Amino acid sequence: MEDVFKGIEKEIIKIYKIPERKGRFSNFKFKNKEINELIDALGFKLYLHQVKALKYLYNKKDVVVTTSTASGKSEIFRLAIFDNFLSNPDDRYLLIYPTRALINNQYEKFSMENELFYKITNKRVKAEILTGDVGLEKRREILKDKPNVLFTTPDMLHYQILKNHNNYLWLLKNLKLLVVDELHVYRGVFGTNMVYVFKRLLKLLKRLNNNLQILCLSATLKNPKEFVKLLFNRDFEVVDKSYNPSSRKYLAILEPKNLDNKQLLRRLIENLVDNNIKTLVFFDTRKETEKLMRFLLNSKVFYKLSTYKGTLPKYVREEIEEKFKNGEILALLTTNALELGIDIGDLDAVINYGIPPDGIFSLIQRFGRAGRRDKEALNIIVLRKDGLDYYYKEHLNELYERIRKGIIEYMPVNIKNRFVTKKHLHYLISELKIVDFDELNDFEKEIVKELEREGKIKIYKNPITNKTEIRNVKQPIYSSIRTASDESYYLILDKPWIKSKLLNKTQSEILSFINWLKIKGYVIEEVDKDEYYRSLITGMPYFSRGKLFIAKDKIGIRKFHFIFADELDMFWDVEALQKKEEEIDILDIYDKKSYKDIDIYYGRLRVRKIYEGFIVRGVDVDKYYQELLALKDNGILDAEIDLFKDFFGLNFISVKFNKKIIRDFETDGIWLCYFQIILGMLTK
């Protein structure tokens, strides 16, 4: 411990010790004795909470298991699947995970146990992965082979299985168990979308006379019963106490005093790496990971570090994960991409830069990653100059208690989001062909009437049944359940032959070509629309894993966008700041509340972002200026480019677009009006 904080002792506010916990074990009698043999072969004993969950499952109950990180939740469904497979080999199982990385990780674990299961029983459970990475040929193979277990994402359940449910009747008619892992991530707009994705699934299964069971797995929630009721409109049995052993942990709170934030993080990381301590360093944004990585370019431990982001190609992420597992890399600078349970081997320490925007929620998940193999763990928070950080600095004991208990207290899901509800009701009507109007709640009936006014569906009285029914008129366009856009943006090394090949590909060929480019290392990152406008407009510098790139031209082919980039000297010190304006129009007000003299509105907004250019600052702007001039000379960058220098060395480049870039979109939002307060201030 002393070595970890050597040279930064004065930055420590407080260190807490979280005591170790002993495990409690129990036994369970499976239908088939081979499963008990499998447990023996795996070399573990069942924890008491695993046995409680299994008892509920075997009594035909829906179950939510909300226990601490690394408490063996996944073992519950794996054992239940293997057991039921021996008795009912035609049953099917759908396993939902929020990320592809987590699916790959869990599929690997399932496959390892499946091999042991085969050695014991001479039978193997057929399991497949269905994600956006899976090509058309493999998808056809899945439909032909009809695996027992399907690992998939919420997105593929929405886009693929429900949209094309006639192709998946072999799965849906025989679906015995739906497993939803990492349930706690289903919050915010994503959570609202998932309420309706699950509603569509359950209504379809009801049509198919399938009353399946649901098993949900989650980090520790304060209100699990209410939360799963909100998501599924079903009653669940709750298992919410962990009986797995837990190692001793330390929680250290640091605040930059004599050092600035970057210097403190650097010293801390260097001390941890010098002591061979495997560490994750969490940041709120991808940009922050890259900024610190660049600050560490001349550090003695630089080659033991890497950034890790969800935007990196799959093969790059897997390469980083493997190097971290075997100790070639000792510290990862990451975002929430590693917040979930991806297996990266033993982990000794977690640093979080500040309190995350969602408060303690993410801290609990991140800190749960360290000390997962009966080893002591060190959790560190480096406070920022931020409102939330200031609050917890003044309430350290509250922070400690909430982390120690590991309970996520608040899960915001708004089930009355009109925009989301309207989309999913249209999908539902399209998928089921006919929907009983009276099966909808009052809010949904109101939305359906809007859809009828828009000419998308028809409400009519069935003369035979005398029921009011809804039929589809216009096919819906399926959009993302995570973002407002379905478009994909790829940052690619600039090679002329790639451009010519892309322009001659069909849509189905493009997906295969993109995967080939990823494997060959030409794809630097895959980003979303927001990140493109934020960081990758032509001429802007972009950092990835410590390397420096300059964004060049972009070509768009339907929903695919390709930004070409050149790699520059990684040691150049440059940074871009955008020049933009924002205009907001209020389209609709859904709700209004008042607090004292403040009016709080919730409604629909139209946002217009006007990008006028950007500024580049840093030590090496002279060199970067030449790169920008080359882009202009080649007709790639249509802008006025000026280099400004002053006596103090505060040099910068101003890039002003000759044609402003405009981005329009609609979103739900909250806004405040406090006219009376402002009026009072002006009066004074």
Curated annotation (Swiss-Prot):
Residues 54-239 form the Helicase ATP-binding domain. One of its GO terms (molecular function) is hydrolase activity. Keywords: ATP-binding, Helicase, Hydrolase, Nucleotide-binding. It holds the Pfam family DEAD. ATP binds at T67, S68, T69, A70, S71, G72, K73, S74. GO terms for biological process: interstrand cross-link repair; nucleotide-excision repair. The keyword Nucleotide-binding applies. A motif (DEVH box) lies at residues 181-184. Its EC number is 3.6.4.-. Residues 264-419 form the Helicase C-terminal domain. It is an enzyme of class 3 (hydrolase). The keyword tRNA processing does not apply. Gene3D superfamilies: P-loop containing nucleotide triphosphate hydrolases. Belongs to the helicase family. This is Uncharacterized ATP-dependent helicase MJ1574.
